[in-house]
Amino acid sequence: MDAVLLEHFPGGLDTFPSPYFDEEDFFTDQSSRDPLEDSDELLGDEQAEVEFLSHQLHEYCYRDGACLLLQPAPSAAPHALAPPPLGDPGEPEDNVSYCCDAGAPLAAFPYSPGSPPSCLAYPCAAVLSPGARLGGLNGAAAAAAARRRRRVRSEAELQQLRQAANVRERRRMQSINDAFEGLRSHIPTLPYEKRLSKVDTLRLAIGYINFLSELVQADLPLRGSGAGGCGGPGGSRHLGEDSPGNQAQKVIICHRGTRSPSPSDPDYGLPPLAGHSLSWTDEKQLKEQNIIRTAKVWTPEDPRKLNSKSFDNIENEPPFEFVS
């Protein structure tokens, strides 16, 4: 080796000036050095690109308040961004510094070289165990994970849920129909062939309740010593028993007379109406020994005649009348 060098360089290696030949620099393995460890060797554009990529990686890996993938690459201040060194193997992980909670505010990029960051952009994923990283997730992240893990219902389960919903709906409608049937049985109705609808039932119930309210407010005596009648031309009278002990409710059937032959009459073509009375008074007159009985009769309205009458007016105009 020396013979070959002397053959080509008769003056020896000492003839080269020192700036061109440094034994330490010549025999140093440059390939083993990390260019990121020495920030002075990086150019300005390369340094800016490294910082930009580091910030982008941090934003990508930060999920649900914790960075579980990567940590930001060191920039101009590698000691400020680097995670703290691990302690002894037996030292607990709770004593590690620079670790922040998931909800703590993140420090801006880049960090100042002279002071440590207020909170690292990653919650020390390199020094925390998987259990500690999982415990750092906040309540919202846990709820989101639970929603993602919600299992999909099978077709059989969906069919069972639909059947249960249908059964509940049928029971609800059946209870409503039973309630309307009970309401129809407590109010006097017309000799109407078709069963009253729910709307007509409510209208008649409102009128009947108003009639009963008028009786209570007027404080009319309820006496069962006799029964009242419904007079008028062509009218008929159904009397009850005149026994003093009879306190049962009495129904007075009132007929309007023969059907009017005139088509312009409002009652043309309508069947007779039934009136219901819960109170009556006796006015005994000694003249010719005649007894006149009067009663306050509530006459239900025919739903077929309510087309021209608004629903609001029926509460203010209860369908009852005085007959004698």
Swiss-Prot record:
Tissue specificity of this protein: Expressed in precursors of pancreatic islets, acini and ducts.
Chain ranges of the bHLH domain: 160-212
Disruption phenotype: Early postnatal lethal phenotype characterized by a lack of the exocrine pancreas, however, islet-like endocrine cell clusters are formed. A redirection of pancreatic precursors to intestinal fates is seen. At 16.5 dpc embryos show reduced size of cerebellar primordium and cerebellar aplasia.
Residue numbers spanned by region Disordered: 302-324
Keyword tags: Cytoplasm, Developmental protein, Differentiation, DNA-binding, Neurogenesis, Nucleus, Transcription, Transcription regulation
One Pfam entry name: HLH
Segment forming the signal sequence: none
Task performed by this protein: Transcription factor implicated in the cell fate determination in various organs. Binds to the E-box consensus sequence 5'-CANNTG-3'. Plays a role in early and late pancreas development and differentiation. Important for determining whether cells allocated to the pancreatic buds continue towards pancreatic organogenesis or revert back to duodenal fates. May be involved in the maintenance of exocrine pancreas-specific gene expression including ELA1 and amylase. Required for the formation of pancreatic acinar and ductal cells. Plays an important role in cerebellar development.
Protein name: Pancreas transcription factor 1 subunit alpha
Gene that encodes it: Ptf1a
